[in-house]
A protein has these predicted regions:
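N-terminal amphipathic alpha-helix/helix-capping segment at the start of soluble metabolic enzymes
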Residues: 18-41, 129-137, 141-142
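An N-cap/entry alpha-helix motif that binds or orients negatively charged groups
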Residues: 1-31, 112, 116-126
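Active-site entrance/lid segments in N-terminal catalytic domains of soluble metabolic enzymes
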Residues: 15-16, 45, 50-166
């Protein structure tokens, strides 16, 4: 939920209340050397933990990217960290001022654009490692779990620190 914090969504989400579709067997496709039911997936960001992975796998997504993790815990940026935006005027190449917060949100998904900056929060490694194992156990045959990993430099550590962490 956009009106709740990352921590709240991590603990309580997802809040999906619909029914799950019946998933039929399909001929498998190749995806970077792995066989998957489809190439329909979820990018890094919204699958905060194994509950989120399980929900989206049951909704029919077959390539599921576990929320970005780090070698240490990192908090999320405070709200608002996800806003709907619209162009200020016609998009001009090279212009710095091109977007503003949307005055109203369109009901047509093709007209909706959002800007997100969560700050790539992460649970501590001992938490996410155990949860990634749990997430893998919730996948069906033909589904693939990708874990998004990012390096975190030590305070004032520079490039060498980032490389060492990664």
């Amino acid at each position: 939920r956009r009106d709740r914090s990352y921590r709240w969504n991590y603990r309580n989400g997802p809040t999906f209340t619909g029914s799950f579709p019946r998933i039929t067997d399909a001929s498998q496709k190749e995806f970077f050397g792995s066989k998957v039911n489809s190439r329909l997936g979820v990018a890094a960001g919204i699958l905060l933990n194994s509950r989120w992975v399980e929900c989206y796998s049951r909704l029919g997504f077959d390539i599921l990217t576990y929320k970005t993790v780090r070698s240490s815990e990192r908090p999320c940026y405070p709200l608002p960290n996800w806003v709907f935006v619209e162009p200020i005027n016609d998009l001009e190449p090279g212009s710095d001022e091109i977007l503003r917060k949307a005055r109203r949100r369109s009901r047509d998904p093709a007209e909706v654009t959002s800007a997100v900056c969560f700050g790539m929060p992460s649970q501590p490694p001992e938490v996410w490692r155990k949860d990634v194992r749990s997430a893998r156990g919730k996948l069906r045959r033909g589904q693939l779990l990708v874990v998004s990993v990012v390096g975190t430099p030590a305070e004032g550590g520079g490039e060498a620190s980032l490389v060492e962490d990664f």
